[in-house]
């Protein structure tokens, strides 16, 4: 895995997410209770970008087009119609910079 600086910690609002690009890969970065999480930004049900069509429910991200939800900690589907989990990326904060491990 390659660790890439993707954002500054302050760029991600608490309780929400922002989309960043990591070597051409759209990544959704979330901040909840000060912790940073990252998943693919692409809905596994219809391929839209989650950052453009989402609502947060604690550790769940909902795609508002079809109301499916995933747990951002594991990528697991919590509410269908999606059946495929979101890809989850390992994150690390170093000196207020957010790093994500991408392939």
For the regions a language model picked out, list residue spans one by one.
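Zn-dependent metallo-beta-lactamase
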Residues: 1-21
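Rieske [2Fe-2S] iron-sulfur-binding domain
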Residues: 17-103
